[in-house]
Amino acid sequence: MRNLRNIRFGRCPRQHVTAACWDPETDEVLCTAGPTEESSSIELLRIKGDQDISVDLVASWDAPSPTPDLLVDKVVSLQYLSGSATTCIVLEGGDIYTVQEDKFSGGDPHIEIVGSIDAGISTARWSPDEELLVVVTKANTVILMGATFDPVAEVTMTAEDLKASKHVSVGWGKKETQFQGRGAKAMRDPTIPEKVDQGLPSAHEDGSTTISWRGDGAYVAINSVQEGERRVIRVYSREGELDSASEPVDGLEGTLSWRPSGNLMAGIQRLPDRIDVAFFERNGLRHGQFTLRSPSGPVTAHERIRLEWNSDSTVLAVIYKDLIQLWTMGNYHWYLKQEIPIQPDSTCLAWHPEKALRFAAASTTNVLVGEYIFYTARGSCQPPNDNGAVAVIDGETIKLTPFRTANIPPPMSMFEISVSSAAVDIAFGPNNTTFAVLHHKGIDFYEWPMKNGRSVKPELSHKNAFLELETPEYGVPLRITAVGDEFHLFAQEELGFVHSSRKAGDDTVPHMQEPDDVLLATTTYQDGSSLEAYGQNSAGDLLKITTERGLQLLPVRFHTHMPWFEISKVDGEIVAFGLSRNGHIYANERLLAKNCTSFVLTPNHLIFTTNNHFVKFVHLSANVEELEVPVDDPEKDERCRSVERGSRLVTAIPANMSIILQMPRGNLETVFPRAMVVAGIRSLIDEKNYARAFSYCRTQRVDMNILYDHQPEQFLANVGLFLDQIPDVTFIDLFLSSLR
């Protein structure tokens, strides 16, 4: 039920960028520019910053082509080695360079050729632990080198390797072995494929070779073309021993990315009418697939498609010529979460090795740096409008489920709406009766009414399309948030970070302006009378977003930037709750817990899950020092409850006294926690709604003494009302027998 939301985005114009990688020590991007047909010079650049990007030249040198057959040399691998603080650059002509920067004295960098391969290099890649470099030469040999560039092993890729994995075939699927008489189709075994692939080449076969390591560095996979045979994926151990070779797959292309968790390798299979991402196991056998799609147009028009898993195996990036797609998987369904336009032609994408959702993408004209977070697009949890609204993005489709009406597990949903391009973000308006969908072509406004206490299908009320002048090629919409009955759009354009306000039914062209500060995250707070929006900058300062007065600094703040945060008001005092990437949850600047995985705010509670598989309830207070976090003892403390391993909060419905949890696989569970039920019963007693309070006491097995003990004087003064609301004599007997 989670979407991807942007928290950082920046562009840097730079010509002829050929490769990029991350320096995790400084969170900076290293990239190479050149060589080109006009110049054989290579520049090593260091890109700093997130929104305001600067470029520093680290080193430059001349790298002419070593052979007349290669007109222009090419960078086939770029890697920053943290252990030695050097940058390794591998060129197609066969040279391997290292660049040692002098970061302390600021002197000239040391550039050295540490090795050269006469046959030329098709591709190369360092292992995740930076201990081994795998080089595939143009003579079809695989060379494994140590960290000091000494050869560890050398093997030759031959047609005999295809016999390494003895995939058994007894002719199933071939015409000669199939019964073709009457009723043959009905009798066919569904586990047997209708057609057995022979390894026919793709229509866009480019003869490229790709290397991908498993996350633990124990195995490396090489996707290459075996002349006279087919394209094959070979898996080698760290010692250079052949472990397996893939089965024949028609239309398999040159890209390959091994999921760091190790269970699957992803490749591209081009079929006559579609393009699939095909998955392989380590033994070379197929293990499922999904079909690529894009609201921007048919994906079959793209000649070369590349794949890159992020470091924690949660997101698969699909890189096209002018587009990056981010895909996630839940409940065995693949969701298209984001489409990011880039300048053609894209040259590479590099995920940050430690911050899993940060990446750098390069094209021939610029470098893009972005970062996303997983977040749940939920509506207000303020009764009586807490319908449990949650929206899930899947390309141009928005899947909506009001959990107060129905608990429908993903990938299904109660309602589905479609927009004209890939959705970027969703924001719910006041009382959850309106919402806006931000996509690359504009903003769609919807009315979401309720009928007889149940949510009905949303109705499109207005479309606000972006003008060409407003969203030129460099403009990228990032986020949207509700401010009262308006919606504020945040985007990245040529002049920097900009925002504007939009309103349903208003077709006037708004003015995109630069705010006083760059907001990396936004949230909303709704009480009975208004809907307020708040933002957070990179320093952890909190600001109120207003239409008339712009950004207003709040007296409370975090000590650093929190990717996830919510605002609550207790007795008129603002309390901010924030969650860091390492699981620390804060109330203003006070640390509450160090093992939080998700949290939700209701009018009375802070609810959060922990990596010890508990869900905890903290009663809100205006003084953050008075907030009491329960210990891990669900048997003695009703504010702590055990949950399934890996559960995360989706939303809370105080009116139903329930929370919705999502398991790691993707299935949902509705839980009625004791702390929430008791708080809800107390609220019903305060409202003199004894019928519902009694009903919840029965169904949730709460001691009925609470009906009297919570408000004794009120109960004695309203005995007649109590009897009128509960006319059943057996219920009265049950209540009287429970009194102590």
Predicted features along the sequence, with ranges:
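Short, charge-rich amphipathic alpha-helical segments embedded
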Residues: 695-726
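Canonical SH2 domain fold
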Residues: 642-644, 650-654, 659-671
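WD40-like beta-propeller blades
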Residues: 1-647, 669-680, 684, 706
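A cross-kingdom feature marking charged/low-complexity
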Residues: 656-665, 717-740
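Solenoid-repeat scaffolds in large eukaryotic assemblies
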Residues: 693-697, 731-732
